[in-house]
Every structure is written in structure tokens, then in C-alpha cells.
């Protein structure tokens, strides 16, 4: 049988103390209604023993000692429990053994310690306290650093100057944002006045090469251009300064012609002339260039005419689907099989055109009908993407912008506004002398994975004289009413008013970007007809309005 001491110590370890009696009281049992002891009705109500019950007990040593509250969770012990327990314990210690009393005292102390430890945690070590203090300090410092002040918000909202002029000064300047690349440009650099309203569809010069800029405000900028595996070139000393050095220049060209043709050529070092001086020379002097000077001349002309341009030797694809389309149709009926190579192309000249506003491509030597002249390089994409882009104004113009050509048979177009070759400066004419054809070289192998199996080459449709400007036809949309003027099926006066007014607005928009290469000299030029009709119509409209106003004034004065 288990001794009373072992039972008492076991109950003390469990958090509650009981003394042994004839019937051992368990933690879960409660006193019955016939018992002489009262129930525990509250969390802090101690069990009491009545006087009647104390008389029936055989001996005080079998009376239960005051127990702790049987709470579901551990907690601090009330102070009056310690006092009552101390008094009861002293009362029974006189009649009981000293050994049992000391054991019960140790049990009470252990129970108090367990109850206190359940609610009051032990103190942390010194190292842990230091770590926690460091974490709190770091958190406070980071919160101060991450705090956004009004001045910082103003700095974030400040427009980022990405103007083509290259100036980083944004103080007291008016900006306009590009709708494509989201950069801020100076309004003065694009010939906008301070009072002019802001255009929502504004596109900067980098995104659209046709955007007009105010040259006086633009600082010269030099952009690196990728030339494939070849070295970087910059054209220099190619402009003929006077008639005295013309023979020397021709002699140098002849010397280069006698040398074996190689992929990598050596040119003179870049000069220190800025774009303004080069642009002035290009206006006044003639550029005589052979095929060996195509790339350096292209870089020089591009730096004086565009803000950013990449000269390429192989056409690029917009995506992989364009290349798949060409690979699946490279053997169509209109694809010309020839042993033509781009290195043996005809020589061309690039100089100012007759209107003194645009560059033009001229034949350096005479060409016969059917001769392949030069490859038209650029970025190849589907025509639908060009037509649906609102920045191209295709619905208003009814044709492509300069430096863009539609393929005559495939639903593709070649865009040389950002990448291309010298042929990008070719102009359109109502009397063209070249056409765009698709050539499949027989001997030339692809120069890379991105190299096309076919080439888009300009072919002469008639004999071309030396020095004659090379031009392609206007690629009018099939629904454009200008076809009725071209085919002479209708006159401008007989056209419906919607078509008439649309043609007037379309030709006005086209003439702001480029001119017809015929120079308005031909009587059959549809652009010349529409331009003259538009000017006459506006003049008559102003006269009629002025006459109507004058008539109204007379009638007003004649009233009684």
C-alpha cells in the first residue's frame, strides 16, 4: 500500500495538495451532498470544514488541508490562501508529526512556485536582450529612412528630361511627353510655342523619324551604330569641297576599285565636324559615292538627318512569324531566281533632291532595263500592323510614309525609318523608274540564322541615265479615290463631296512629309492636280465668303 507521504507529494507535484484519508480524494471528484464539507462554488472560494463534520472525524490528522483553487489554467495564488493555509498548518502541526508538517510545507512552496512561473516568464539572457534592443533600434531607423517626405514626392513627380537636344537642364522649361516612349521633350526643340496647346498624340523624333524638330535648338548628338561584325565607320572627307580636288577624289575611288573586294574596309578617322557644318556642306555640295562608301555615307547622312539610326547589312524581322511566312513562300511564282549578290550592286549617289528639303538617291552610272540596283534593307513586318497603327496615319494619307515600302505581292512591308541602308532615301514619284522585286540568290548562302532566304531588291523598269534620280511608285490604297484621277475615269469636280474633301486633306498631309519626285512638272501628276484644285477651291471659298459678307453689309445698310 502506498504511504501517505508518497500520495501527498504526488498530489503536490500535480499542483493541488490533499491529505490522505481512508478514502483518497481524486482531482476530478467532488464532494457529495451528504458530505459534511461544502463544495467549491467559485474560482477563488476555498473549501471549508464545518464544526459538525469536525466532531465526526476520528482524528484531526485525517482532515483535508486547505487546497488551492482548481482552476482550469495556472495562475497566481491569492494571498489569503497562503495565510489560511499557514494558520491551519500550524494548528495541525501541534498534534501531528513534524516530518509530515515539513513535507506539506515544501509542497506548498513548490505549488506556489509552479503557479507563479506559469504567468511570469523567466528573465531573458543578456545576449538575447541586446539582440532584441538592436532589432528594435534597426526597425526604428529603417522606418525613419523609409518615411517619404513631401520634398521627395515632388522629386519623384519631376519630369525626366530625355529630350533629343541632350540638355539635362530642366529649370524654367516647358515639356511635352512622348506618347510612345513616355520621355519628356522640350517644346521649343519641336518648334512649339509656349502658348500652343499640348498634343495628346505627340511622338518624339526617336520614335518617329518624320517628326519635325527645330534644328537651331538641337545640340549635335552622336549615337553608336552596329555594323554587324565589321568595325564602326564614320564618313569623312567624302564631300568634294571644290572643283580642284575632284580629280584627286576620282583617283582615290579608282584606286579602291582596283583593289580586291573585301568585307572589311578601312576608312579614315572620324573628323571633328559637327552635324551643323556637315549639314551645310550636304546642302551646297554633291556627294559622289560608290558602293564601297555606302556604310560610312549612310552614317553621316543619318547623323545629319535623324537623331538615331542603325545601319544594317541584313534585313531584320519583327517576329518569328514573318520569317516563317517568307520561308514558306520563297518559291512563289513572282520570286526571281538570280545569281545576284549584294556586293556587286550598282553604284548610287545620295544628295539633296530638287526640292532642297529631302535627300534623294541618284544613279552613279547608267542602268539598263531589268538591272538589279540595290537591296532595300529594313525591318520586315506584316502590313496589317502598319495599317492599324494610328501613328502612321494610314487612313488619312491612303499610302505609306517616307522610308516605308509595301511588298507588291506579299502582305509584308519593309520599314527603314530606324534601320536600313542607303536606299531608305528613295523617293516616290508618279513616273517611277524602279520597282521592288523579290530575288532568291542561287550562289549566295545565308549569312546567319536571321538572314532571309530571299532579298528585296530595286530593279530598273526602264533605262536610267547617269545622274537621274531613282524613284518608286506611290503605293496608294486600293480604296483611295485618287485612283479615279489616275485612271482619268473622273474629274475632281465630278467626285462626291466627301471624296473630294478627303483627297484635299490627304494630299495636304502627304505634302507636309514629302513631295513627289516628278517635281510637279508633269501634267498628269495626280498630286499636282489635287494640290492646284485645293488651292483654287480655298481661294474661291475665301472670295465667296468675303463677297457674302460684303453683300450682307450692303443689305444691312439699305434697311429703312
Swiss-Prot record:
Q: Which SMART domains match?
A: PHD, SET
GO cellular component assignments: Rpd3L-Expanded complex; Set3 complex
| GO MF term set | methylated histone binding; zinc ion binding
One Pfam family name from the record? PHD
Record PANTHER family: UPSET, ISOFORM A (PTHR46462:SF3)
Which family, according to the similarity comment? Belongs to the SET3 family.
UniProt name for this protein: SET domain-containing protein 4
State the taxonomy lineage.
Answer: Eukaryota, Fungi, Dikarya, Ascomycota, Saccharomycotina
